[in-house]
């Protein structure tokens, strides 16, 4: 009963613009560029939603710094998680695939 991580999209076209926009989705606040400019491309929109959730996670992690004692640890682990998932997302774009990222796929489905 393992959930599939690879999703087949109908419009994973071969143009370079789609891949550049999908790659920009995982670069922090740049996730808004493909989110707003490529809503009609299913491939780019999928990656933009995942990038948006990663960006929101990194913003929320900054608030953990205000917690006494455990805040720095929580921020460090969250930042490492966001960095690793962003790299996995960039690799999936480089391989022209659509992978659901493990920790955030349920939140992305709600968007």
From Swiss-Prot:
Q: Name one GO cellular component term.
A: magnetosome membrane
How this chain sits in the membrane, per its record, is: Multi-pass membrane protein
Q: Which residues cross the membrane?
A: 18-38, 51-71, 73-93
Q: Which UniProt keywords apply?
A: Biomineralization, Magnetosome, Membrane, Transmembrane, Transmembrane helix
> What cystine linkages occur within this chain?
none
Q: How is it modified after translation?
A: Subject to cleavage or degradation; identified by N-terminal sequencing of proteins that are about 103, 92 and 15 kDa in size.
Q: Does the keyword Transmembrane apply?
A: yes
- Function in brief: Plays a role in regulating magnetite crystal size; partially redundant function with MmsF.
Q: What is this protein called?
A: Magnetosome protein MamF
**Species this chain originates from:** Magnetospirillum gryphiswaldense (strain DSM 6361 / JCM 21280 / NBRC 15271 / MSR-1)
